[in-house]
Structure formats: structure tokens, C-alpha cells
Amino acid sequence: MAHKKAGGSTRNGRDSESKRLGVKRFGGESVLAGNIIVRQRGTKFHAGVNVGVGRDHTLFALTDGKVKFEVKGPNNRKFISIEG
């Protein structure tokens, strides 16, 4: 005869692995062509001059230069471009 009542099971206890999103190179930093500037879900930041967009909306440098963040347009969108 059991002296302790059996405990029920829980349906919790899982968590997904973090995706390491965010800005990888900040304004004024030097980058080489191919360097990842931002990893993001959707287009929180938009691609400006000399910046490419990956399939998962990752922004990366197309040329060597310095990273520049700017807010432009009627909707105040954040653009990232590479200067010089």
C-alpha cells in the first residue's frame, strides 16, 4: 500500500535556445565586405547604401567602410548604410 500519493506530471519545463539576434556592428565601427551588421526578425532596420539583406532579414556589408545608422522617410524608418 502506498504511503505517498503519486505526483502528477507537469507539461512545462521546456525553453527554446536563444537566437542571438541584435546589432553586431555599431555606428562608426569599421567593417569588411560580408560582415554581418544586424541579425533580426523582420525589417526592424532597413538596408541603406552598400548594405545587403539575407533571406532571414540579416543585414550585411557589401563593401568595406564604416557603419552609419540613420532615420529617414515619412515613417521614420531606421536605415543602416556603409560609408567610404
Curated annotation (Swiss-Prot):
Keywords, in A-Z order: Ribonucleoprotein, Ribosomal protein
InterPro entries: Ribosomal_bL27 (IPR001684), Ribosomal_bL27_CS (IPR018261)
Pfam families on file: Ribosomal_L27
Disulfide bonds, paired cysteine numbers: none
Disordered: region residues: 1-22
Family statement: Belongs to the bacterial ribosomal protein bL27 family.
Name of the featured protein: Large ribosomal subunit protein bL27
Annotated organism of origin: Shewanella woodyi (strain ATCC 51908 / MS32)
Gene that produces this protein: rpmA
